């Protein structure tokens, strides 16, 4: 009977731990559409600008994901990969020297949405080191730099998919720049 209880407890603990597993994600390397099911997935584009050496960033949704494979361009790390649609929150920044920073899970300023069949720009996570091991965090909108990254690294995907800003606040920069044939600024000056 004791052996049966031990095996049952081991099975329950194994199931619990496997449900808490963090799924590692990698930035796509090739400039071709990697969405397996476009009705259920969208691309995440996230920039990280920091003076702290980070090893990974964790996201929480229905599942937990870790981003640890970045592409460097214009003094920023970028992460670009398909994710299931839904609401995501940045939860943890892991550092190279075995430390980490936990972010406030309830703070909407660290949240963004992944809409299906689109490139979803979540923003630029800015991390600045403070004194005594502290740091400050912001998720800001740098859409023009994100567009430069997509044009340089993923022009084919950019030509196939709509890009939308999904970070804190509202911004229609991508809609104005990518979906117009002429500049509304130039037209108004004439």
Language-model-derived ranges and their functions:
Residues 1-9:
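Bacterial N-terminal signal peptides that target proteins for export
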Residues 8-18:
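Bacterial N-terminal signal peptides
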Residues 20-65, 99-190:
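Primarily secretory-pathway and cell-envelope proteins
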Residues 61-82:
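Tryptophan-paired
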Residues 75-89, 94-96:
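Short Pro-Gly-centered beta-turn/loop motif in secreted/extracellular proteins
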